Amino acid sequence: MPARKHTQWLKKPTVDYVDSRIYSDWDIFYEEQEKIFKKVWIPICHESEIPEVNDYRTAAIAEQNIVMVNLKEGVRAYENPNNLGVAGNLDDTTWLYDCTELHCEVKYGGLVWVTLDPNPTMDVEQWAAGAFDCIQSALDTEPLEVFHYHKGIIGSNYKLWHDTNSEFYHDFMHYFNRVTGFNEEYFARKNTGFPNGHVNVGSFEVNYEAFDGADRGALSFPTLPPNQWYMVDLFPGMNINLRGSALRTDIVTPLAPDKVMIEFRGFGLKKDTPEERAERIKHHNTIWGPFGRNLHEDLIGIAGQ
């Protein structure tokens, strides 16, 4: 590439381009909160986190505190004006009726979806636009249950995390991926785009024997062939990752242009025996847990971009 002087670097490109300020500009950050995060459906938690009547779970979307409550008539979501703890059980729910109720649905394996939009033009299924078709039977055949939760606050823009869940070039950083999956089938996977900005990544069979010498195929999800791997990447930054015996979800909450909170959950089947659950937890945590390997390599990758 020929050398450029200062004015040439500042000159607007003559081809399509993405301005790097999308990763650092506060005005763009606030605009994204208003025009994106306050408008979309977000799978904010799971019904198994609020299993009993009056159980609640708090969260935030676009700096708006919200609370999801398991009421007798079903799961409901409200703007949360109180200083509730992260989760618990409400002795009194009458104050909720003075709060603004938010649109809420339980869909796709028991995920609790919430939108701040008071007049959404689409329900969750319309919003997903077919992106879940590849794994819906695996999620809906049996009730699911959260067995793992941790979160990270990362010095990076949320869009970089979303990118790392949908492209393949960063996988060369991964030791586990190189030994279990770098084959022709891995790179033959197809990224399929859907309306509303969603993508899913086609499946292939992971060779876990190359990693830990163990055949993990005996334990899977309903209708899912052994050791298969599917990913659903939802706009603007949510990830549903079904890999063999465990399901992982990533829910992003942008905190600043250069800071994002990511909540990671691991799921098994509610009907799991103690032995099956222990095996799923082991499989999940080896790759994706807080002391695993793969997840940290992803996070290091986006923090360095």
Where are these regions (language model features)?
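Long, hydrophobic, well-ordered secondary-structure blocks that form the structural core
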Residues: K72-E105
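Short Pro/Gly-enriched beta-strand edge/turn motifs at strand-loop
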Residues: K38-P51, N83-G88, Y230-P236
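N-terminal pre-ligand scaffold of iron-sulfur
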Residues: M1-E79, C104-E105
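C-terminal catalytic domain of Rieske-type non-heme iron oxygenases
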Residues: P51, V67-E73, L102-Q305
